[in-house]
A protein has these predicted regions:
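Short, solvent-exposed loop/turn segments at secondary-structure boundaries
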Residues: 4-7, 40-43, 147-151
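C-terminal auxiliary extensions adjacent to catalytic cores
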Residues: 194-240
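A short, flexible beta-alpha/helix-coil linker loop
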Residues: 1, 34-36, 141-145
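FAD-binding beta-loop-beta segment adjacent to the flavin cofactor pocket
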Residues: 118-136, 187-207
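A conserved FAD-binding loop/helix module that cradles the flavin
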Residues: 138-187
């Protein structure tokens, strides 16, 4: 999944909504992670684990979905111990993320990693192709360890712009992308954590001392639902 926060948000919201009214206490949620963590940043992964524990959400690890039998309502997962079946009433599936065919078949993808995804082979700091210096990549197709969110693109564009202009002028750009990624993680209706981090898994909050990144806050929810929407809409029009 490009952003591990997406299925986590869904899980938290389903739990929050199911815990209200006459359905309260009548649901059981299992979260099947494809690897051995809940989030790529260790401190965030541990925070999510603690939230899951407090809400009786049961995580299982290294479960890769293989098949679904909708008639029997059974999902089959590949695990280190062999195939495992889990029954369900409601199943939310995150499909594998890959670059578009036009990118995968272009010869621009990494040959020694992310081979199933086909991400473009670029330098993680400059976003410039390692073999074709006239090619740059940003956003989802960029083959970098982090940076597949809209917030990442906002930080990547100035870097690519700097290097493109420098290359046109026969020089070398100076801007560097540090892997900045933002994940406003909704944990319940009206609460969220504004998680921001870099390549080194350091938390890099935009509002230190004001918005704590690992606390469920109303202001983080407001940022997600109001402020960021306007920013992303402006980005689509090249105005932010």
């Amino acid at each position: 999944m490009k952003c591990a926060g997406a299925p986590l948000k869904h899980t938290f919201l389903i739990d929050d909504l199911a815990s209200r009214g006459p359905a309260k206490g009548k649901h059981k949620i299992t979260y099947a992670a494809h690897n051995n963590v809940l989030f790529s940043v260790p401190i965030v992964s541990e925070k999510v684990r603690m939230l899951f524990e407090s809400r009786a959400i049961a995580p299982v690890y290294s479960h890769v979905l293989k098949a679904i039998d909708p008639g029997k309502r059974i999902a089959t997962f590949a695990t280190p111990a062999g195939n495992k079946e889990l029954s369900y009433d409601y199943l939310h599936v995150i499909p594998p993320q890959r670059a578009p065919d036009v990118v995968r078949q272009s010869g621009l993808s990494w040959a020694d990693k992310w081979t199933d995804q086909g991400w473009v082979e670029v330098d993680p700091k400059t976003l410039r192709h390692n073999r074709f210096p006239e090619v740059f990549a940003i956003g989802d197709v960029a083959g970098v360890p982090k940076g597949k969110t809209a917030a990442s693109v906002k930080w990547q564009v100035p870097v690519v712009e700097d290097h493109l202009i420098a290359a046109i002028k026969g020089g070398t750009g100076t801007q560097v992308y540090n892997g900045y990624t933002s994940c406003p993680m909704i944990t319940r209706v009206g609460r969220a954590m504004l998680v921001e981090f870099d390549y080194r898994d350091n938390l890099v909050p935009s509002f230190p001392g004001i918005i704590a990144p690992l606390e469920e806050l109303w202001i983080s929810w407001l940022m997600k639902e109001v402020a960021l929407k306007a920013t992303y809409n402006a980005m689509l029009r090249g105005k932010a």
